[in-house]
């Protein structure tokens, strides 16, 4: 099974489970969790089921295309099930079977690993899922996003699709993964890994990045104050990525790092609060249980 087929199999499987198949979000981010289809939709009472591929950028992880397992740009396959179904682990194992991995024939372990994103003010109870000694998935029950409680709790499944592809194809290097017949992962991404590693570690202009961070922070605040949730969140993502670039350039001290994280977290909380207010004003249109919807609206009016 090539890399492209793997993604299509996951799309098909989760689509059959009732998930919306969304497309990647068009702003740089460090993880699929940061896509608004997860970060924002995990908030509030409305149900939500979504699956998508998310290109993820982590500038400090670049290795100039020389490390077979470490990349500054890679893919995650993200699934959100809200509220979390009782059979979520069974669904995950069924998805592995659909990829040709029979759980009964392998050593599959859940290793406790609670997840936290300080910049997003988000955390959850979770586990790494290991396949024959290699981590392939992160499973999380969201507890908070943007500092607000997630009620109902969402289940997040984040597949490391390069690792799964390496396992299925019996490859030792991510760059040897067959994307499609005759085209490898290296053909698609290797030169970009080299170029971005040079940029992230050597060429990025620290002064310009610092100025851009300040500008994006100001714009996030200004736009959020106008209750424009999605545009404001875009600037939160930009701030997060700019912080990661500055970190890769070695331009942030330990003290400054804490301050930068706090600044991004405050922005994320501000946008999360505006999102919750926006959905309330819209009377929770995705909440199909009319009785529950009216009850929530009445309770919030009392508060």
UniProtKB/Swiss-Prot annotation:
SUPFAM superfamilies: Class II aaRS and biotin synthetases (SSF55681). PROSITE patterns: AA_TRNA_LIGASE_II_GLYAB. It catalyses: tRNA(Gly) + glycine + ATP = glycyl-tRNA(Gly) + AMP + diphosphate. Keywords: Aminoacyl-tRNA synthetase, ATP-binding, Cytoplasm, Ligase, Nucleotide-binding, Protein biosynthesis. Its main location: cytoplasm. The keyword ATP-binding applies. InterPro entries: aa-tRNA-synth_II/BPL/LPL (IPR045864), Gly-tRNA-synth_heterodimer (IPR006194), Gly-tRNA_ligase_asu (IPR002310). CDD domains: GlyRS_alpha_core. The keyword Electron transport does not apply. GO terms for biological process: glycyl-tRNA aminoacylation. GO terms for cellular component: cytosol. Transmembrane segments: none annotated. Its EC number is 6.1.1.14. GO terms for molecular function: ATP binding; catalytic activity, acting on a protein; glycine-tRNA ligase activity; transferase activity. Gene3D superfamilies: Bira Bifunctional Protein, Domain 2, Class II aaRS and biotin synthetases, domain 2. It is found in: Cytoplasm. NCBIfam families: glyQ, PRK09348.1. Belongs to the class-II aminoacyl-tRNA synthetase family. Tetramer of two alpha and two beta subunits. This is Glycine--tRNA ligase alpha subunit. It comes from Syntrophomonas wolfei subsp. wolfei (strain DSM 2245B / Goettingen). The gene is glyQ.
